[in-house]
């Protein structure tokens, strides 16, 4: 009997542990410091458009750019020439230089109209140097643009689906310069947590030290864990691959409510709880009605004139908001039921959540984005 009770108690404890923590790989919780993408940008011209390019009278930089490009190719445009081009558009080209990118590697580029071009569909991007923040050229972009939108116009009417003023070129740029990296220099590497958490940083450090020896990992702060690595490059890759595949028991995160003030969206995680409180909510509406009355003479021979008068009316309406009790809720489903019982719109719900937080009834961090 005692043995059965002990087994049952052990199963209950294991169930509680699995519900409050989950095993995740270190690679899903962290990133390697210094291993990141770098932004590239360039200015270029798109040609071959079917009459949907820039209006050069309104975008003089397009004509200037074309003249400069032609002069570099040995073609001189007479000064004062008014080039009316409809198949050329000035664009900005952006790309991401991947970590450990090598010369000759292809990367995707995004092409966006800079002027007033109607569409970039069917256009070809001419050779465009892509520079980094240090003003050095790291890649060259060129190729046919793929535009995901579609549109048509006739007789003054037009129809457009999605965006026509931007597109992508898959593998449209070639890396010409490699970015130097400091990966694993001096036998030290830092892992950066995706979210700052002192306990998680300590857990990651303890897990690595248990498998690779004491002193291998050291938590520096709530977001950084420092690793002591081999100095050989091949051994560093093997060591980091091993560390990233280690699993860590991750406790349940902080209770959090995210409110988007622009769209009215409200998102909660499963740890949000409510204390008992009473809520009253009501809307105040101001209605302005402007009625137009036309007065005309009864007979055309009376010599009167038609008079237009306006009768404005202003009314204020306030909806009654009785106090409603919100019961304490210990789970996300109960929180949803309690808030839905108020019958509040998303905009009202944002104000209610703020008031609940101020009153200490919302046991969660409220973030407004």
Curated annotation (Swiss-Prot):
<keyword id="KW-0975">Bacterial flagellum</keyword>
<keyword id="KW-0732">Signal</keyword>
<keyword id="KW-0574">Periplasm</keyword>
<dbReference type="Pfam" id="PF02119">
    <property type="entry name" value="FlgI"/>
</dbReference>
<dbReference type="GO" id="GO:0030288">
    <property type="term" value="C:outer membrane-bounded periplasmic space"/>
</dbReference>
<feature type="signal peptide">
    <location>
        <begin position="1"/>
        <end position="23"/>
    </location>
</feature>
<comment type="function">
    <text>Assembles around the rod to form the L-ring and probably protects the motor/basal body from shearing forces during rotation.</text>
</comment>
<protein>
    <recommendedName>
        <fullName>Flagellar P-ring protein</fullName>
    </recommendedName>
</protein>
<dbReference type="InterPro" id="IPR001782">
    <property type="entry name" value="Flag_FlgI"/>
</dbReference>
<dbReference type="GO" id="GO:0005198">
    <property type="term" value="F:structural molecule activity"/>
</dbReference>
<dbReference type="GO" id="GO:0009428">
    <property type="term" value="C:bacterial-type flagellum basal body, distal rod, P ring"/>
</dbReference>
<dbReference type="GO" id="GO:0071973">
    <property type="term" value="P:bacterial-type flagellum-dependent cell motility"/>
</dbReference>
<comment type="similarity">
    <text>Belongs to the FlgI family.</text>
</comment>
<comment type="subunit">
    <text>The basal body constitutes a major portion of the flagellar organelle and consists of four rings (L,P,S, and M) mounted on a central rod.</text>
</comment>
């Amino acid at each position: 009997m005692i043995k059965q009770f002990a087994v049952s108690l052990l199963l209950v404890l294991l169930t509680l542990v699995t519900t409050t923590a989950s095993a995740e790989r270190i690679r899903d919780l962290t990133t390697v410091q210094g291993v990141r993408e770098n932004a590239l940008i360039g200015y270029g011209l798109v040609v071959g458009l079917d009459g949907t390019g820039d209006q050069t009278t309104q975008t003089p930089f397009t004509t200037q750019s074309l003249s400069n490009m032609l002069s570099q190719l040995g073609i001189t445009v007479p000064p004062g020439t008014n080039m009316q081009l409809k198949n050329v558009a000035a664009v900005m080209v952006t790309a991401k230089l991947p970590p450990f990118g090598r010369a000759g590697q292809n990367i995707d580029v995004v092409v966006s109209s800079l002027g007033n071009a109607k569409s970039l569909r069917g256009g070809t991007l001419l050779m465009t140097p892509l520079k980094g923040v240090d003003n050095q050229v790291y890649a060259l972009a060129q190729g046919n643009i793929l535009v995901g939108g579609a549109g048509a116009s006739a007789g003054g009417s037009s129809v457009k689906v999605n965006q026509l003023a931007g597109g992508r070129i898959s593998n449209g740029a070639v890396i010409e310069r490699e970015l130097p990296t400091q990966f694993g220099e001096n036998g030290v590497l830092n892992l950066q947590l995706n979210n700052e958490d002192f306990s998680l940083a300590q857990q990651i450090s303890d897990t690595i030290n248990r498998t690779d020896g004491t002193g291998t990992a050291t938590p520096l702060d709530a977001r950084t864990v420092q690793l002591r690595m081999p100095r050989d490059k091949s051994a560093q890759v093997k060591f980091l691959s091993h560390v990233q595949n280690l699993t860590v028991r991750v406790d349940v995160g902080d209770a959090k409510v995210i409110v988007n003030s622009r769209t009215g969206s409200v998102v909660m995680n499963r740890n949000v709880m409510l204390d008992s409180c009473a809520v009253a909510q009501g809307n105040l509406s101001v209605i302005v009605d402007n009625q137009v009355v036309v007065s005309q003479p009864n007979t055309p021979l009376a010599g009167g004139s038609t008079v237009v008068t306006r009768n404005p009316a202003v009314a204020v309406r306030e909806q009654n908001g009785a106090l409603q009790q919100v019961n304490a809720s210990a789970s996300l489903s109960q929180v949803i039921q309690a808030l839905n019982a108020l019958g509040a719109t998303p905009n009202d719900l944002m104000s209610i959540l703020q008031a609940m937080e101020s009153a200490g009834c919302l046991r969660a961090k409220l973030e407004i984005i």
